[in-house]
From Swiss-Prot:
UniProt organism field: Campylobacter jejuni subsp. jejuni serotype O:2 (strain ATCC 700819 / NCTC 11168)
Name of the molecule in the record: N-acetylgalactosamine-N,N'-diacetylbacillosaminyl-diphospho-undecaprenol 4-alpha-N-acetylgalactosaminyltransferase
GO BP annotation list: lipopolysaccharide biosynthetic process; protein N-linked glycosylation via asparagine
SUPFAM superfamilies tied to this protein: UDP-Glycosyltransferase/glycogen phosphorylase
Entry EC no(s): 2.4.1.291
CC annotations in GO: plasma membrane
Cell membrane in keyword set: yes
Function as written in the Swiss-Prot or TrEMBL entry: Adds a GalNAc residue on to the Und-PP-Bac2,4diNAc-GalNAc disaccharide in the N-linked protein glycosylation pathway. Transfers the third sugar in the heptasaccharide biosynthesis.
MF-aspect GO terms: hexosyltransferase activity
Membrane protein topology class: Peripheral membrane protein
The organism's place on the tree of life at top rank: Bacteria
Pathway(s) annotated for this protein in UniProt: Protein modification; protein glycosylation
Transmembrane segments: none
Length: 365
């Protein structure tokens, strides 16, 4: 049995982390899997496999220190792969990607497959140290991979057009979801008895919850707005809710490891994100038969929903456009029902069995 090294920063909460946890049970049937982490947080149930820690760092580590440590971690990673006899590396997230690619420069000969789950030119659009370093490292290192697996067409196009990556080195591997598990968890009860609109995501600027709240405030509706997630903007959003006199209508319920029970019971799902790689939450909302109002963000929104075929797209960072989208979904019962009826059909394209089959094809070369 071939040895597969899956290298990711941690298995804490996050989209790439959830994809790894979803694929692990199937990949473990075909490979002897070695999970290589840089942080000991594991938030998901995973099958029995060998776990190795390259280091135990903190996400809040100084960015300059992170950069300076890369070559030393690459040498350590090269030695670990050699000692374990790894045949193929499957690497997720930027920092592990850089380390594995530097290890390739230092002589690591194993087959190297990396995942790209963001749109780098959007993710690193600011003119600061972090963005400049990341763009430089992507341009320098990514061409050294044997195969790059962006999780959307938009992310693939970004690598080709903005980082001069050869399209011959790239194949799309969409995010995997566990439809059966989602369906089971969606059956759980919730304490909330009122009808509601739902949004799920970290409380940060990228998710743009403030715009969603302001757009919702203009609706004439008895529906609550429920937001699941934690983040640095919680106090700021609570202040906005108070300013708009919405304390009884907008509910910040924090993180819930089972958002599906809310998705299955909401009137519709609203998502105001400024950018995404390819959002797990949106796929999961479709798996729960949600009608969706979503910003036409880069990348993946239009790829997932089509031209309003599976969800209603609105302009990014445009309060009036979001308001009109919410209003349309609220008032057009026929449209809302039509989206609900075909949502799960769209979600089936991302079921773990299909995506794992694609992953195995790429990993086995």
């Amino acid at each position: 049995m071939q040895k597969l090294g899956i290298f990711i920063y941690s298995l804490g909460s996050g989209g790439a982390e959830r994809v790894v946890a979803t694929l692990l049970p199937i990949l473990s049937l075909k490979f002897e899997v070695h999970l290589i982490l840089m942080n000991d947080k594991i938030s998901y149930e995973i099958p029995e496999c060998q776990i190795h820690f390259l280091e135990c760092s903190k996400p809040s580590e100084n960015p300059i220190l992170k950069f300076l440590k890369l070559p030393f971690l690459a040498l350590k990673y090269k030695k670990l792969c050699r000692n374990l006899g790894i045949d193929t590396e499957f690497v997720f997230l930027n920092r592990p990607n850089y380390i594995a690619l530097m290890a390739r420069m230092f002589g690591n000969k194993t087959r190297l497959v990396i995942n790209e789950c963001t749109t780098p030119s959007v993710m690193y659009m600011k003119n600061n140290f972090n963005s400049l370093v990341n763009k430089f490292l992507i341009s320098l290192l990514y061409p050294k991979a044997d195969l790059i697996l962006p999780n959307s067409k938009g992310n693939l196009e970004d690598l080709v057009q903005n980082f001069s990556i050869s399209p011959k080195k790239c194949e799309i591997l969409y995010n995997a979801i566990d439809l059966e598990n989602i369906g089971q968890k969606a059956l759980e009860d919730i304490a909330l008895k009122d009808k509601f609109i739902l949004s799920v995501g970290r409380l940060d600027k990228g998710k743009n919850h403030a715009l969603l709240i302001r757009a919702y405030a203009r609706l004439k509706t008895d529906l609550k707005l429920v937001i699941l997630g934690e983040g640095v903007l919680k106090d700021e959003l609570l202040a906005l809710i108070k300013e708009l006199n919405l304390e009884e209508k907008v509910l910040l319920l924090g993180f819930d490891n089972n958002p599906y029970k809310y998705m299955a019971k909401c009137e519709f799902f609203a998502f105001a994100s400024v950018f995404e790689g390819f959002s797990n939450v949106l796929i999961e909302s479709l798996a729960c038969s949600c009608a969706v109002v979503c910003t036409d963000h880069k990348s993946g929104a239009r790829e997932l929903f089509g031209d309003d075929e599976f969800g209603l797209l609105v302009e990014v960072d445009n309060e009036n456009s979001m308001f009109q989208g919410l209003k349309t979904m609220l008032e057009d019962d026929k449209l809302r029902k039509a989206y609900k009826n075909k949502a799960k059909t769209r979600a089936k394209a991302f079921d773990k069995v299909k995506i794992a089959r694609d992953a195995l094809k790429y990993l086995l070369g």
